[in-house]
C-alpha cells in the first residue's frame, strides 16, 4: 500500500482517537465511542470500496480488451510505462461515446489505463499518446491511492460532526455523565466546517496532481503541444455535444479520474482549426470560485502551464 498511504491512514485513526478523547473530556459525553466506531466502519468501507473499485469501474464503464486494430494502444502504454519506470498497466477500452481517459487500480485488481471509444474516434494517434502519457503519470505518482487516503479526513470529520450535532439536538449523551448538548452541537458544527475545509484542500491537491500528470505527459512524449491539442478537442466536443455531457453526468463514479472534467462549459466551434482553438482557450477567463470547488484546473490554466513547460523542454524530440 505504500508508506505514504499507511501514514495517512494512521493519522486518520489518531485524529479519530484524539477527537473521541477530547469530546469525552470536555463535553462529558460517555458515548463518544459510537462516533469513533462509526468512523472506523466508514474507513473500512472506503478501503473495501478502493480494493474492489476497479471491478466496479470496469462494469459501469463497460470496458473491454482492445480489439484487432487497437493493439497500438497497448504498445503505446507499454512504451510509456517503460519510460516512466513502471510495470505496464492493463489497457482497456470503454464502450462510452464521451471522449475521456482515466487511470485506476488497487492492490487486488492491479493498475489500469482506460480510454473511451469516443476518445479514439476524436483524437489522432499523437494526441491519444499524449493523453495516455498523462494517465500513466497518475499511476507513476500514485495519485488515485493518495487522493483516496486524503479523502478519509473529510469523511471522518463529516461523519463525526453530523453524529455529534444530532446527539446534541436529541439531548446529549447517556450514562451517569450527561454531556452538555450545546457543547456537542458546537463541536459537531466545528467538525463539519473543518470537513468542508479539508474537502477544499483535497480538491486543491487533486488539481495539483493534474498539473503533475500534464508535465509527465509533456516530458515522456516530448510534445506538450499534442496534449494541448487533445485538451482543446475534448473540451470542444463536450461543448457542442450535449448528449456527451448527459452521458458523463450519468456515469460520475470515475469523474475525478478523467483527464478532463466533463461538465465544463466553453465557447468553441468544432470546425475551427485546433491550434487556433488552443490559442483562444488560453485567453479564457477563469472563475476563482468555480475553480475552488473543482477537481480539475481550468483548461486555460493547463494550456498556459504547458506553454511554460514547452519553453523549458523545447529540445526534446518525439519518440
Swiss-Prot record:
InterPro entries: HtpX_protease (IPR050083), Pept_M48_protease_HtpX (IPR022919), Peptidase_M48 (IPR001915). The chain crosses the membrane at residues 3-23, 32-52, 146-166, 182-202. Binds 1 zinc ion per subunit. The active site is at residue 135. Zn(2+) binds at residues 134, 138, 210. The keyword Iron-sulfur does not apply. It is an enzyme of class 3 (hydrolase). The keyword Repeat does not apply. Its cofactor is Zn(2+). Its EC number is 3.4.24.-. This is Protease HtpX homolog. It comes from Aeropyrum pernix (strain ATCC 700893 / DSM 11879 / JCM 9820 / NBRC 100138 / K1). The gene is htpX.
Amino acid at each position: 500500500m505504500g508508506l505514504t498511504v499507511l501514514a495517512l491512514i494512521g493519522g486518520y485513526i489518531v485524529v479519530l482517537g484524539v477527537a473521541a478523547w477530547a469530546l469525552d473530556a470536555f463535553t462529558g459525553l460517555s458515548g463518544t465511542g459510537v462516533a469513533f466506531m462509526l468512523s472506523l466502519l466508514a474507513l473500512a468501507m472506503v478501503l473495501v470500496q478502493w480494493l474492489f473499485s476497479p471491478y466496479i469501474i470496469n462494469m459501469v464503464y463497460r470496458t473491454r480488451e482492445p480489439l484487432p486494430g487497437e493493439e497500438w494502444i497497448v504498445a503505446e502504454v507499454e512504451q510509456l510505462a517503460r519510460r516512466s519506470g513502471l510495470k505496464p498497466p492493463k489497457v482497456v477500452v470503454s464502450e462510452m461515446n464521451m471522449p475521456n481517459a482515466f487511470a485506476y487500480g488497487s492492490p487486488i485488481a492491479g493498475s489500469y489505463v482506460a480510454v473511451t471509444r469516443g476518445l479514439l474516434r476524436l483524437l489522432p494517434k499523437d494526441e491519444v499518446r499524449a493523453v495516455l502519457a498523462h494517465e500513466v503519470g497518475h499511476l507513476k505518482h500514485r495519485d488515485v491511492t493518495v487522493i483516496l487516503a486524503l479523502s478519509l479526513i473529510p469523511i471522518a470529520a463529516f461523519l463525526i460532526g453530523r453524529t455529534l450535532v444530532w446527539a446534541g439536538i436529541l439531548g446529549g449523551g447517556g450514562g451517569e455523565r450527561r454531556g452538555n448538548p450545546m457543547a456537542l452541537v458546537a463541536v459537531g458544527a466545528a467538525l463539519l466546517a473543518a470537513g468542508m475545509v479539508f474537502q477544499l484542500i483535497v480538491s486543491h491537491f487533486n488539481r495539483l496532481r493534474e498539473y503533475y500528470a500534464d508535465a509527465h505527459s509533456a516530458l515522456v512524449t516530448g510534445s506538450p503541444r499534442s496534449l494541448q491539442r487533445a485538451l482543446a478537442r475534448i473540451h470542444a466536443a463536450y461543448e457542442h455535444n450535449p448528449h456527451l455531457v448527459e452521458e458523463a453526468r450519468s456515469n460520475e463514479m470515475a469523474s475525478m479520474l478523467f483527464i478532463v472534467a466533463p461538465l465544463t462549459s466553453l465557447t468553441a466551434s468544432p470546425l475551427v482549426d485546433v491550434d487556433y482553438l488552443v490559442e483562444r482557450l488560453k485567453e479564457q477567463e477563469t472563475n476563482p470560485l468555480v475553480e475552488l470547488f473543482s477537481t480539475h484546473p481550468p483548461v486555460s490554466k493547463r494550456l498556459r502551464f504547458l506553454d511554460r513547460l514547452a519553453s523549458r523542454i523545447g529540445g526534446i524530440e518525439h519518440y
